[in-house]
UniProtKB/Swiss-Prot annotation:
Residues the entry annotates as binding dCTP: K101, S102, S103, F104, A105, R106, D117, Y159, Q168
Functional summary from the UniProt entry: Catalyzes the deamination of dCTP to dUTP.
Keywords: Hydrolase, Nucleotide metabolism, Nucleotide-binding
Quaternary structure annotation from Swiss-Prot or TrEMBL: Homotrimer.
Protein name according to UniProt: dCTP deaminase
GO molecular function terms attached to this record: dCTP deaminase activity; nucleotide binding
Keyword Hydrolase appears in the UniProt entry: yes
InterPro entries reported in the protein's UniProt record: dCTP_deaminase, dUTPase-like_sf, dUTPase_trimeric
Active site: E127 (proton donor/acceptor)
Biological process, per Gene Ontology: dUMP biosynthetic process; dUTP biosynthetic process
Disulfide bonds: none
UniProt KW Cell inner membrane keyword: no
Lineage per the UniProt record: Archaea, Thermoproteota, Thermoprotei, Desulfurococcales, Desulfurococcaceae
Length: 180
């Protein structure tokens, strides 16, 4: 079941879920709008092969930076990691589905399907893929819509048990090696 605005406000009011900083205007009919944070990571063009089963120096593959109020320009078809300004804490009985806000999608920007697991705590990191033309994004602008789905029962082992990105603030690059 998807939570309505009333259900979301009830979870927040009872302290079962947290969003910080939070503005009531972020709650929409069936989800919450989240805004762009200040840090970003650009994927570099390189011929170096990254082996996901080994520890790697990821600075060869990513350029990390911080946005000022002017933001950054996402180049055509470029892949960039952004994060939410908001830190969220998910309860054990909710899962989040992240969608790009329609206005950004209508500009040709795209994000892969993204799930926020039950028990996750942190800022959400999103890969955004550029349009056919350059697009400037700025911190503080609402860019994703988080929809909450209630599980049939609280999960037995939530994200805090084995999640690599628990507690993340800003951009946390992939954790390597990925275990087989």
């Amino acid at each position: 079941m998807i939570l309505s605005d009333g259900g979301i406000k009830s979870y927040l009011r009872r302290g079962l879920m947290k969003i910080e900083p939070f503005d009531e205007n972020q709650v929409r009919e069936n989800g919450v709008d989240l805004t762009i944070g200040h840090q970003y990571a650009r994927f570099k063009n390189t011929e170096d092969v990254l082996d996901v089963t080994k520890e790697e120096d990821l600075s060869k593959y990513y350029e990390l930076g911080f946005m000022d109020d002017e933001g950054i320009v996402i180049k055509p078809y470029e892949h960039v990691l952004l994060h939410t300004r908001e830190y969220i804490e998910m309860p054990a009985d909710l899962v989040g589905l992240v969608n790009l806000k329609s206005s950004f999608a209508r500009l040709g920007l795209y994000i892969p399907p993204t799930v926020v697991d039950a028990g996750f705590k942190g800022e959400i990191v999103i890969e955004i893929i550029g349009s056919s033309f350059p697009v400037r994004v700025r911190p503080g602008v609402p860019f994703i819509h988080l929809v909450f789905l209630r599980t049939d029962s609280p999960v037995l082992r939530d994200y805090s048990v084995r999640g690599h990105y628990q507690g993340q603030r800003g951009i946390r690059l992939p954790k390597l090696p990925i275990k087989l």
